[in-house]
Amino acid sequence: MGIKVKVEFLGGLDVISNGVREHKCEVPLEEGEATMIDLIKYITATIISDPKDVPVFIEEGTVRPGILVLINDTDWELEGMEDYVVESGDVLTFTSTLHGG
């Protein structure tokens, strides 16, 4: 049994997932709860298409600075960041705020 969530990559961040902006996922859950850290591990293992792109998304075990993270349209800083317990039906949006020029 897993947790069904929608993961979105916006602001050009979709390049790390073969240009796919929206992913409907079922995150495996053996027991207990899944936190955002578990979801981040799931994303790096299953959604990011090229391992060389992981540093575009992750730095020091968490989402890189410059990527806005929303949980159900609320800034993840207000939701507990990595400690947020992911629930079925959640929409998790990752938006790059850094753009080339």
UniProtKB/Swiss-Prot annotation:
Entry keyword set: Cytoplasm, Isopeptide bond, tRNA processing, Ubl conjugation pathway
What biological-process GO terms show up in the record? Answer: protein urmylation; tRNA thio-modification; tRNA wobble uridine modification
- Where is the protein situated, by its record's location annotation? Cytoplasm
Q: Does the keyword Acyltransferase apply?
A: no
Instruction: Tell me which SUPFAM superfamilies the record gives.
Output: MoaD/ThiS
Residues bearing 1-thioglycine are G101
The pathway to which it is assigned is: tRNA modification; 5-methoxycarbonylmethyl-2-thiouridine-tRNA biosynthesis
Q: Does the keyword Ion transport apply?
A: no
Tell me a GO cellular component.
cytosol
Instruction: Summarize what the UniProt record says about post-translational modification.
Output: C-terminal thiocarboxylation occurs in 2 steps, it is first acyl-adenylated (-COAMP) via the hesA/moeB/thiF part of UBA4, then thiocarboxylated (-COSH) via the rhodanese domain of UBA4.
**Could you tell me at which residue positions the Glycyl lysine isopeptide (Gly-Lys) (interchain with K-? in acceptor proteins) crosslink is annotated in this chain?**
G101
Q: What is the superkingdom listed in this entry's lineage?
A: Eukaryota
Q: Tell me, in a sentence or two, what this protein's role is.
A: Acts as a sulfur carrier required for 2-thiolation of mcm(5)S(2)U at tRNA wobble positions of cytosolic tRNA(Lys), tRNA(Glu) and tRNA(Gln). Serves as sulfur donor in tRNA 2-thiolation reaction by being thiocarboxylated (-COSH) at its C-terminus by the MOCS3 homolog UBA4. The sulfur is then transferred to tRNA to form 2-thiolation of mcm(5)S(2)U. Prior mcm(5) tRNA modification by the elongator complex is required for 2-thiolation. Also acts as a ubiquitin-like protein (UBL) that is covalently conjugated via an isopeptide bond to lysine residues of target proteins such as AHP1.
What is the similarity comment for this entry? Belongs to the URM1 family.
PANTHER family in UniProt: RURM1 PROTEIN
Q: What is this protein called?
A: Ubiquitin-related modifier 1
Q: What is the lineage of its organism?
A: Eukaryota, Fungi, Dikarya, Ascomycota, Saccharomycotina
Gene this protein is translated from: URM1
